[in-house]
């Protein structure tokens, strides 16, 4: 199985992100923990899934480095919005475990994305 993972960082935190709008990835806590391990995996503070949503532009699932789902903080939300923009998404109303969020991309280049969350 080929896995397409992306690594984003913002304000000192780094994240592994998957585009899961087609529900391709169903990772276990053990797999997430291994991916986030800095010695044996990609290494990250957490992992996110950009998902499909019927009500919003997309959904967000965030997992801490221990493999378990957590709530959104600012840095992960900004990184996911930047990832969504790089994947061609133009509107940024999304739901996460802690509810509805909206964001605005203020600046967008291939290597930099400034997000208001």
Could you tell me what each predicted segment is?
Residues 1-112:
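A glycine-rich beta-to-alpha transition motif near the start of alpha/beta enzyme domains, typified by
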């Amino acid at each position: 199985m080929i896995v397409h993972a992306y690594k984003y960082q913002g304000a000192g935190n780094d994240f592994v992100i998957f585009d899961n709008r087609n529900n391709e990835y169903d990772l276990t806590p053990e797999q997430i923990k291994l991916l986030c391990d800095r010695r044996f995996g990609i290494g990250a503070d957490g992992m996110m899934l950009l998902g499909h949503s019927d009500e919003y532009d997309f959904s967000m699932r965030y997992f801490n480095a221990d493999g378990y789902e957590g709530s959104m903080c600012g840095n992960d939300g900004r990184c996911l919005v930047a990832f969504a923009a790089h994947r061609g998404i133009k509107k940024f109303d999304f739901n996460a475990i802690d509810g509805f969020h909206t964001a605005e991309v203020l600046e967008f280049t291939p290597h930099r994305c400034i997000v208001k969350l």
